[in-house]
């Protein structure tokens, strides 16, 4: 745990520039203000649901957020060479295109209507909505990793923080941080444990119980002839899975993978884009994603693994589900 705190301190010491961080904060404030004042995502972008232009609008939003923050980093660090780097455009373009397809994907609606004659549409819709990332994010990134992401040799690889030759970070087997690492597990476990009392307190609030659990009784268990806990478990597994592609793309591909191009500069642009994917959420949650995204990004760069972020994200999500289930069960 001490090692990770030292890594975080070292990252801030090397990466922090008052002018860069202030400019990035202003850029974030502008994006947040425009989105929530004009309700850009909910009232405009989402009005194109089931329309081929829907993912294109997400692409415009995310590209603006990401490339704007990259420009700030290259400007203050005097790194115009980044914009002439083919690898930068290949990686950033891949991430932007496929995440925008994921955000604006609506094929699962059709699949849910067609499977089983649409008799369990609601259950299939909620499950397939969480699983569609297998096609839209995980598979494309895996193909990119296998066929486009050439591993640099030790003599030609650019300097990357915490890079140690001969480790799994240098071998093709580590798919953008998917290889588990012991480093940081104690810290991540502690961070998750600290959330338990907060989740417990939140579970007594009416607003919380109005949103959680996200699982809803759709009578799918009656259709399949199984106890309801079976359909609830299937849904919760699908729900938990949806955090995997988010961590894989943002902390894995955009931080660990992009470090070959930007080094420590991968974190800030990732944070801005990560904030933008929360624009449809309450403002407090969106703002908090900035701090969480920054911390998880630095730790992913340090550990060369996304498992810490997965542990925290999935743990909190399932913790809120369990707390809500217990509250509603106790009221019956």
Q: Where would I find each of the regions flagged by the language model?
A:
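Alpha-helical transmembrane segments
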Residues: 15-34, 91-102, 190-195
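Hydrophobic alpha-helical transmembrane segments
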Residues: 21, 89, 93, 185-189, ...
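Alpha-helical transmembrane segments in multi-pass membrane proteins
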Residues: 39-71, 81-151
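Membrane-embedded alpha-helical segments of multi-pass membrane proteins
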Residues: 56-64, 131-139, 232-233, 245, ...
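Juxtamembrane helix-loop-helix connectors linking adjacent transmembrane helices
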Residues: 104-242, 330-332
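Membrane-interface helix/loop boundary segments of multi-pass membrane proteins
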Residues: 148, 166, 173-189, 211, ...
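Functionally important transmembrane alpha-helices
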Residues: 267-332
């Amino acid at each position: 745990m001490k090692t990770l705190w030292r890594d975080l301190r070292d990252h801030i010491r090397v990466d922090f520039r008052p002018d860069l961080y202030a400019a990035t904060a202003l850029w974030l404030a502008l994006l947040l203000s425009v989105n929530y004042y004009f309700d850009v995502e909910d009232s405009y972008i989402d009005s194109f649901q089931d329309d081929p232009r829907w993912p294109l609008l997400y692409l415009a939003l995310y590209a603006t957020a990401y490339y704007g923050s990259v420009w700030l980093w290259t400007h203050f660090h005097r790194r115009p060479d980044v914009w002439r780097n083919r690898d930068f455009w290949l990686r950033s373009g891949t991430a932007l295109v496929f995440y925008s397809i994921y955000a604006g994907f609506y094929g699962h609606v059709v699949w849910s209507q067609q499977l089983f004659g649409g008799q369990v549409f609601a259950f299939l819709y909620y499950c397939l909505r969480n699983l569609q990332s297998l096609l839209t994010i995980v598979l494309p990134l895996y193909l990119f990793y296998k066929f486009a992401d050439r591993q640099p040799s030790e003599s030609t690889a650019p300097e990357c923080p915490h890079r140690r030759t001969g480790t799994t970070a240098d071998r093709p087997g580590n798919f953008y941080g998917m290889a588990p690492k012991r480093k940081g597990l104690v810290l991540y476990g502690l961070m998750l444990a600290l959330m338990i009392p907060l989740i417990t307190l939140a579970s007594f609030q009416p607003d919380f119980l109005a949103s959680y659990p996200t699982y809803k009784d759709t009578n799918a268990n009656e259709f399949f002839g199984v106890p309801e806990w079976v359909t609830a478990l299937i849904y919760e597994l699908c729900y938990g899975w949806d955090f995997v592609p988010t961590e894989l793309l943002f902390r894995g591909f955009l931080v660990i993978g992009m470090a070959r191009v930007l080094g420590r500069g991968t974190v800030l642009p990732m944070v801005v884009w990560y904030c933008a994917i929360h624009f449809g959420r309450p403002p407090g949650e969106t703002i908090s994603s900035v701090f969480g995204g920054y911390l998880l990004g630095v730790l992913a760069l340090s550990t060369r693994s996304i498992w810490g972020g997965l542990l925290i994200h999935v743990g909190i999500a399932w913790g809120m589900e369990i707390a809500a289930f217990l509250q509603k069960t106790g009221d019956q």
